[in-house]
Amino acid sequence: MSIIFHENTKEFHLTNGQVSYIMEIMENGQIGQLYYGKALRDRDSFQHLHEEKMRSLMAVALPEPSSLSMEFIRQEYPSYGTGDYRMPAVTIQQKNGSRICNFMYQSHEIFAGKKSLAPLPSTYVETEEEAETLEILLHDEVIDTDLVLSYTIYRDYPVITRNVRFFHKGKEAIVLDRALSASVEFNDMEFEMVHLAGAWSRERYVKRRTLEMGIQAIQSLHGASSSEHNPFLALKRPDATEQQGEVYGFSLVYSGNFLAQVEVNTHQMTRMTMGIHPEMFSWELHAGESFQTPEVVMVYSDQGLNKMSQTYHRLYRKRLVRGEWRDKVRPILLNNWEATYFDFDEEKICLLYTSDAADEENLV
C-alpha cells in the first residue's frame, strides 16, 4: 500500500496491489483524473493517460497553443463557471450573486492512518498501518476559501474513501449551494448503472439501466436516505456478471437527503457525482467557519458484482460498525407487531413471551 507523488510530472498514484487511482496537477492548477481501475505498476510518468484534443465550439482554459478544455477533461472536483458545462460538484454563491469559483492547487500532505469525520459517521482504522491518506489543499483567491480533497486507501481492501472540507477565510460570507462528496470520471460510457430501489416493505430491488447521453440519477428528498433509494450505485461493464468483469461501487455514508448522479456528455464521457442533495441545501460560511461533507466509499472489483458486495460487507462490518457489539452475537429481539398487528391483549403478549418457540432476550 502506498501513495506516491511524482514531483517531475505532478502526479499522485494511490495503489495497494488491488486498485490504482491516479491524478495530476494540470497546467491550469486544477486537479485532473488520469486513471481509476485495476492496480498498475508505478512508473515515472502516466502522462500518456492525459487526453486532450481540439473539439468544435469548446471553451479553452489557457491561451494557445493549449487545447485544455474543462468540458472535455476528467476532473477531480469540477466547479461551475470554468468552461465546463456539465453538472459541477461545487457551486458557491458570493455576496454579489456570482456563483463562479476556481480552486487551484496549493499543497498536499500524505500521512499514515485516517482522520475521523466525527460527528459524521465514517469508516475508520484501528492502527495507522491499515491505511494511508492524501489531502490536497486547493484555494480560490477571489473568495479566499480553502478546499481540501481527502483520499484514504486501505491496505487490505480495494477501497478508496473520499470527502471534502471547506474553510472560509474571506471577510464576506459565502453560501455553499452545492457541495458534493466525490466526482469520478471515465473516458467512455460503456457501463450499466446498478442501484437499489423500492418502497416501504419492498425495499432494495436491484435495478439496471444502460447509460445514455444526458443525466440519470437517484435521490432522496425525504430528509432521510429512505426506503425508496439506497445512497449507493455501481457502474458495471456490460459483460460483468456476479463473478467476473469490472464493477465500480460508490456508497455514501450519510442518512439524509442525497443525490447520486451519472452524466454522459456529447462525446461519451461519463461523470459520477455523489453527495448531499443540492435541493434545499444552502450553507452559509463566515470567516473562520468550515463545512465537512459526508464520506463516499469507492470499491473497485475486477471479479464482478459479488466481489464488490463482499468488499462492502467486510469493510462495513469491521471498519464502519463500531462499539461493544461489533464482534459479538447480538441479543434476539421479538417484536409483536408482525405477529399480532393491532389485535393483541395481555394474554396474547404473555403467550408470545412464554412460547417454547420464542428464544428471545428482549420483547417489544
Predicted segments with their positions:
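Short acidic, Pro/Gly- and aromatic-enriched capping/linker segments at domain boundaries
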Residues: 1-12, 270-285
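Short Pro-Gly-centered flexible turn/kink motifs
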Residues: 103, 283-302
